[in-house]
Amino acid sequence: MTLARFVLALMLGALPEVVGFDSVLNDSLHHSHRHSPPAGPHYPYYLPTQQRPPRTRPPPPLPRFPRPPRALPAQRPHALQAGHTPRPHPWGCPAGEPWVSVTDFGAPCLRWAEVPPFLERSPPASWAQLRGQRHNFCRSPDGAGRPWCFYGDARGKVDWGYCDCRHGSVRLRGGKNEFEGTVEVYASGVWGTVCSSHWDDSDASVICHQLQLGGKGIAKQTPFSGLGLIPIYWSNVRCRGDEENILLCEKDIWQGGVCPQKMAAAVTCSFSHGPTFPIIRLAGGSSVHEGRVELYHAGQWGTVCDDQWDDADAEVICRQLGLSGIAKAWHQAYFGEGSGPVMLDEVRCTGNELSIEQCPKSSWGEHNCGHKEDAGVSCTPLTDGVIRLAGGKGSHEGRLEVYYRGQWGTVCDDGWTELNTYVVCRQLGFKYGKQASANHFEESTGPIWLDDVSCSGKETRFLQCSRRQWGRHDCSHREDVSIACYPGGEGHRLSLGFPVRLMDGENKKEGRVEVFINGQWGTICDDGWTDKDAAVICRQLGYKGPARARTMAYFGEGKGPIHVDNVKCTGNERSLADCIKQDIGRHNCRHSEDAGVICDYFGKKASGNSNKESLSSVCGLRLLHRRQKRIIGGKNSLRGGWPWQVSLRLKSSHGDGRLLCGATLLSSCWVLTAAHCFKRYGNSTRSYAVRVGDYHTLVPEEFEEEIGVQQIVIHREYRPDRSDYDIALVRLQGPEEQCARFSSHVLPACLPLWRERPQKTASNCYITGWGDTGRAYSRTLQQAAIPLLPKRFCEERYKGRFTGRMLCAGNLHEHKRVDSCQGDSGGPLMCERPGESWVVYGVTSWGYGCGVKDSPGVYTKVSAFVPWIKSVTKL
């Protein structure tokens, strides 16, 4: 596999161990406008308790060569159905709503024929039927289940978004029965109305047909004064009368102003005798918004059995009662047992019906239930602080969302613990719960409302927990809290011994293991810590994939007590508590031995070769670049964040060679370092080895590889008694361009252009290595941001020692002394070019002490040696 094809495979999601690559490659080029939709039509009316529809406008012209900013939905084989006229498809929105053409945040979809470069990047068989299609209806050509489409953002970039299949749904409100009322349309997550201008019977007939209330409708009008605050979506609707959905009619987007006569569109459908909806009431609740569902039928009140009772049924009940807010189903006589007959069983609503009478169900009085199974609902009004779980199979699981100022938003998982989960599930009416993996549920597109939430476990409501102010966070939606709650019973009990959390990892699936014992969080000593122990921890946290143990404070040293030592799991236990054989608090360890884990670990090596043709286009990619806050101003680097960082090691008879110098990978077989690294031990190739893919110097990892040295090339002008020409190349052992195996953790850096002036082209510069941290040499790879300085600083400070083949970099401020000591001799000084490729501009060479005031570090200027490097390496 060539390096170019390897990187393309990573872009298409073919290699499971690569996470976040798309954001690295494309964030600066394409940003989803989910957080700030483009400006567009004005909505003069809107509901105070619902989200205002996102503003949209037609997309700007497409870029000439658009590239997808993130991975498309995962490819799955699925046979597409041909046909030019859009009809209900199993791979689009469900039957009845196949004409949806906007994303769930309101952006209009592009026609499929307008984005051929995207389709050409995917397997042809999966996309063949969409090429050339002029429609822009939401589809799911990859068979992923949820339809999506491409859209254009305000900067002319192309992105993709999931669609809301309820968009365009209609209902009638305020009539004497279900066959008449004001027309309300569902768009962008909010119900709104239609201005009555040019509203006629053809338009009304389409509404009646869409609601399956007959094929003929009579146009009516309703005064806006009686509707309250509600958005107006359309005006001048112009249906022929034979359309199957109001979305297919010509119409104008409402642009504000005054609707003629201040009247909203309404209809009366033509059925002369329609079904009579049963009378419903809620009983046994603490307010009018909740209770046991009771129906009046055949002269008496009765209950509903909870067999197959879910939130879709609850939504219909709330709608029929005229109650807005969050609809939630309750089971097992949650609001007490009723009396009288059990009226209905096996109710299976889709959630779009106007009445329970329209839902599939048993015959009246036919059931196999007792009153212990009476169904209930709650229709919780939307007030600030209301919580819900969204995106799951039911109200018991999903993404945690909080309602605030008319909009649902998510909660960041920073510092999230099982105690927080207990409080959430308890407020939602469940006894137990656990944090779920975020990839089980789709990412949100709304705001992130809360961060750094900390509950004691005694709170009765989620908002009683300590937290940041509303909207203050440093997170992305990849860090949204997801939860699965359980109703109770031994099979769902989550109180499995002690609460467990993972701290200081790069994501919530990894980190230092901490347990909550005797009211205090503490760590676990790594004595005897193995993958079997890690598997139990990950299982307790809800992760099902492979688990890997990490030792020696791999994720940093914890604070507080060391609770547990000598854990002995077989790998089959349900919780950590089943593995503890030693008294709590008894140990002989320090925090430098804190245990850690990585859950859902997929560490397959991906082999690949570099070659001259592909190297220039794919070098300098940080495929595992993740959260920016962990990089800017940080010390510990991201694992795999600097994939070209390698170490030159001195071989020993014990096989545990000492780290001698840092170095930079330029290709599969060539490494760049400093000439002075060979001054003490000579240039015999048998004395050295090069380690690639390293992060923690004492913990072997799957991507790590130690390779012998075949050739050492020191610049011919270098003299050991001087610092000029301090540059060398090392050829690794192996066949041509097949020495180091490329992976997400092992990739080459880019070379600068000959005589390129980095101050003119580079920003965001870093030095990396296992160098001095102020206390000792680090076990984990360090990084430090460092500014490039004008050469006059070093010329004045170092006089004749500083030449034109050197760079000057460092921070001259008293409180920010960062220089080459925090890297390694021979290690890279990397800067980011526009377009997110990283270039090795300097090789760590020399300086006066570590962090000495007014003594910046000096680096060999790589751009001055590009012709020499290319002549030696043939790159």
Swiss-Prot record:
Domain of life where this protein originates: Eukaryota
Entry EC no(s): 3.4.21.-
Alphabetized SMART domains for the sequence: KR, SR, Tryp_SPc
An individual GO BP term: zymogen activation
CDD domains per UniProt: Tryp_SPc
Glycosylation sites recorded in the entry for this protein: N26, N683
Chief place where the protein resides: secreted
Residues in Peptidase S1 domain copies: 631-874
Extent of the signal sequence: 1-20
Residue ranges occupied by any SRCR domain in the UniProt entry: 170-271, 280-381, 387-487, 500-601
Residues covered by the Kringle domain: 93-165
Compositionally biased intervals (Pro residues): 56-71
Compartment(s) where it occurs, according to its Swiss-Prot or TrEMBL record: Secreted
GO molecular function: serine-type endopeptidase activity; serine-type peptidase activity
Cysteines joined through disulfide linkages: C93-C165, C109-C149, C138-C163, C195-C259, C208-C269, C239-C249, C305-C369, C318-C379, C349-C359, C412-C475, C425-C485, C455-C465, C525-C589, C538-C599, C569-C579, C619-C750, C661-C677, C765-C831, C794-C808, C821-C850
Positions of the record's site feature: Reactive bond homolog: R630, I631
Disease tied to this protein: Intellectual developmental disorder, autosomal recessive 1: A disorder characterized by significantly below average general intellectual functioning associated with impairments in adaptive behavior and manifested during the developmental period.
Role summary: Plays a role in neuronal plasticity and the proteolytic action may subserve structural reorganizations associated with learning and memory operations.
Protein name, per record: Neurotrypsin
Gene that this sequence comes from: PRSS12
